[in-house]
Amino acid sequence: MDKSESTSAGRNRRRRLRRGSRSASSSSDANFRVLSQQLSRLNKTLAAGRPTINHPTFVGSERCKPGYTFTSITLRPPKIDRESYYGKRLLLPDSVMEYDKKLVSRIQIRVNPLPKFDSTVWVTVRKVSASSDLSVAAISAMFADGASPVLVYQYAASGVQANNKLLYDLSAMRADIGDMRKYAVLVYSKDDTLETDELVLHVDVEHQRIPTSGVLPV
């Protein structure tokens, strides 16, 4: 074989090697694209269940309706004697109340017992007249008429009873933020005196988004 043939054979070998290298690279690129597509689909699936500014998580477990968010307030009942009652109107922050025509879809109450809690309480949320003074007699009658759901919360050795939430759906009533002044959270201490530092009630009001809802609620 003369020098020109040797040079030609060397070039052919290099071409074959380069073609093989390009083929391996193309295969790797294709695999990478497939993997990227799979990861993208997985990310979209996971993202669908995440809270976002437009679709926050309602009460830590269920997402708000599209276009809705929620405002939370905290109530700490004072001492309630055995077989006596406590009532507190829902007073949302002024920054929320100024959008009084925004619709409210649901109210959720979460009962959070403090370490010394050892009682049984009944909890409900009711629409009450503007003239009601939320006296013991008035609250007693509202618990007795069966017009709204009641959560019976009892002492649990674990510290938190599994069923510690009450959901009140207002969608059919077309209630709005302005109407929240007409609603009250009511508590009945059934068997024991409820001390001031025994119970905390977290009230979450799900309503249409307002301009002040610039961050996810906590």
UniProtKB/Swiss-Prot annotation:
Gene3D superfamilies, per the entry: Cucumovirus coat protein, subunit A (2.60.120.530)
InterPro entries: Cucumovirus_coat (IPR000247), Cucumovirus_coat_Asu_sf (IPR037137)
Membrane-traversing stretches: none
Keyword flag Disulfide bond: no
Protein origin, superkingdom: Viruses
Bias kind Low complexity: ranges: 1-10
Physiological role: Capsid protein. Probably binds RNA and plays a role in packaging.
Similarity annotation: Belongs to the cucumovirus capsid protein family.
Protein name per UniProt: Capsid protein
UniProt organism field: Cucumber mosaic virus (strain Y)
